[in-house]
Amino acid sequence: MKILPGLTSTESDRIPAFVEALRRSDVRAIALFPTVLDPAERNELYRDLAAIPGLTIPHVHLRTDCTPDEMRFVAEQFGTELFNIHPRKSRHPFGEVPSDYASRVYVENVEIAPEDDELAALAGICPDYSHLESARLMGSTEYAATVERQLGSYPIGCCHVAGIRAGEPNVWNGGPDHHNFRSLADFDYMARYVDVLPARWISLELENPLDEQLEAARYLERLLGDRRRWTGRRGLSA
């Protein structure tokens, strides 16, 4: 299992610095979250990323305006293997998934949980653990129970990991989940989910600079590795 730093574009003014740091580093695998970028802006970003020799993007979060041609492009240019989308009843549904990509597209839990039949029709679930943990802490018991059940029932191909900053409400729903972390302890909640992780990649959905994300990745590797050494069951940890 590899932890991928994320190029997350909610704060798009941070993108140039991230790309330059990536270019200067030996990191050659990232996840991409083009959250606020329109097609023209994404094309410009793709050109910048394509100029980095050997760069791969195993996991891409698809915006609602991503086309089949764009999916094919990133798969061919960057070796993208897995995609995620929002549920069809969410505020930003993706729409119809091209049939030739259905086995590579996973549905994320966002402000609502995915429906079982859409998980069954596509590749499975892309858990956003910070959304789930935020819902659990805020008392959204039905949502949390649904997603936790789905984690034990459907394939988990990719995921989102962000920070939980207790006592610091975010701007979108007042929860403690944030795309910026302030302390490595903001990831301690992930110990709860060690037995429901993807097999290959954990994607950091963070706005922090690359060097800070790499520090977070090392912390998570230790945290999750230590936790896995003494638990062998599939399911949520206590």
Predicted regions and their residues:
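N-terminal pre-domain/capping segments
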Residues: 1-62, 234-238
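Hydrophobic faces of well-ordered beta-strands that scaffold small-molecule active sites
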Residues: 1-9, 28-32, 56-62, 81-85, ...
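Short, acidic/polar
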Residues: 10-23, 42, 65-76, 115, ...
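A structural motif corresponding to the C-terminal end of an alpha-helix
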Residues: 25, 52, 77-78, 101, ...
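Flexible loop residues that form catalytic
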Residues: 35, 88, 110, 130, ...
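A short, acidic, flexible beta-alpha connecting loop/helix-capping segment that sits on the rim
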Residues: 36, 90, 203-213
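Active-site acidic/histidine proton-transfer and metal-coordination neighborhood
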Residues: 46-127, 134, 185-189, 212-222, ...
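Gly/Pro-rich active-site loop or hairpin
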Residues: 133-200
